[in-house]
């Protein structure tokens, strides 16, 4: 659950950064950003989804070979967490692609 919470926290941080950027007045000089960049945050989110999927696969494999202490409910919950996090990442990707296409179609 904490990985899903971390992903949600990253999404909220990105939204807050977007709102801050939109509320600041436009200036001619470019200021250095001291926080993490969007690319870093997106990379962290992708890595967390990857970690969730790997943990789910390991738990599934452990259950399949009959390792003691691995419960079917844990396997199913882990599998659903991995599925939901991947679907969320796919939606983020789709929104990024759509935003890129919208920008590219803007008249100059």
Swiss-Prot record:
GO biological process assignments: bacterial-type flagellum-dependent cell motility
Main location: other
Domain of life of the organism encoding this protein: Bacteria
Pfam families, sorted: FliE
GO cellular component labels: bacterial-type flagellum basal body
Family membership noted in the UniProt record: Belongs to the FliE family.
UniProt name for this protein: Flagellar hook-basal body complex protein FliE
Organism: Pseudomonas fluorescens (strain ATCC BAA-477 / NRRL B-23932 / Pf-5)
The gene coding this protein: fliE
């Amino acid at each position: 659950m904490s990985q899903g919470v971390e992903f949600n926290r990253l999404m909220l941080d990105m939204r807050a950064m977007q709102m801050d950027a939109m509320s600041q007045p436009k200036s001619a000089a470019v200021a250095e950003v001291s926080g993490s960049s969007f690319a870093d945050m997106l990379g962290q989110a992708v890595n967390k989804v990857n970690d969730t999927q790997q943990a789910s696969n390991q738990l599934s494999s452990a259950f399949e070979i009959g390792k003691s202490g691995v419960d079917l409910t844990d396997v199913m919950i882990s599998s659903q967490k991995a599925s939901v996090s991947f679907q969320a990442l796919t939606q983020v990707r789709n929104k990024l692609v759509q935003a890129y296409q919208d920008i590219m179609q803007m008249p100059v």
